[in-house]
């Protein structure tokens, strides 16, 4: 597997078949794991097409497996970045870390996607 992220909060690896494995560690790891699982399920129920799909969630290992949403974006216009996160709010989720490091580009359909929902919140009225 290719390791793409290794921080105090999480390790992320991409398998050869393209699935993304994220393991949570550090402060509040169980809480962040639970939150990301809840947010991804919320977005899938609303058919949000520009976020990863949750394939597995293992609370005993604090690990999720998701679909791959492409490669990290190096440059994105500030206005387009705002539009992307505003579009996400239309599905009832505020990301709370609206940074380019949480945006990928999926070449298969030319779509910018949003990843990393461990700090996100579900907006009032969407719960």
What is the predicted function of each stretch?
Residues 12-14, 20-22, 51, 65, ...:
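Short hydrophobic-acidic sequence motifs that mark active-site Asp/Glu residues
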Residues 36, 97, 116:
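Acidic active-site catalytic centers that drive phospho-/nucleotidyl reactions
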Residues 98-105:
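Hydrophobic residue at the +6 position relative to the catalytic HRD Asp in the kinase catalytic loop
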Residues 90-94, 106-127:
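C-lobe/activation-segment region of protein kinase-like
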Residues 25, 29-33, 37, 41-84:
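Conserved structural core of kinase catalytic domains
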Residues 1-42:
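ATP-binding glycine-rich loop module of kinase domains
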Residues 70, 100, 119-121:
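Short, glycine/acidic-enriched loop or turn micro-motifs at the edges of active sites
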Residues 15, 58-60, 106-108:
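Structural motif
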């Amino acid at each position: 597997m290719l390791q793409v992220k290794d921080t105090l909060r999480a390790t992320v690896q991409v398998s050869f078949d393209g699935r993304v494995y994220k393991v949570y560690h550090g402060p509040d790891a169980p809480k962040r794991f639970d939150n990301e699982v809840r947010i991804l399920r919320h977005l899938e129920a609303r058919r949000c097409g520009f976020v990863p799909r949750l394939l597995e969630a293992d609370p005993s290992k604090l690990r999720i497996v998701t679909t791959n949403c492409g490669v990290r974006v190096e440059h994105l216009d500030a206005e387009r970045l705002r539009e992307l996160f505003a579009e996400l709010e239309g599905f009832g989720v505020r990301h709370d870390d609206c940074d380019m490091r949480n945006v990928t580009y999926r070449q298969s359909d030319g779509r910018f996607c949003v990843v990393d929902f461990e700090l996100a919140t579900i907006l009032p009225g969407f719960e």
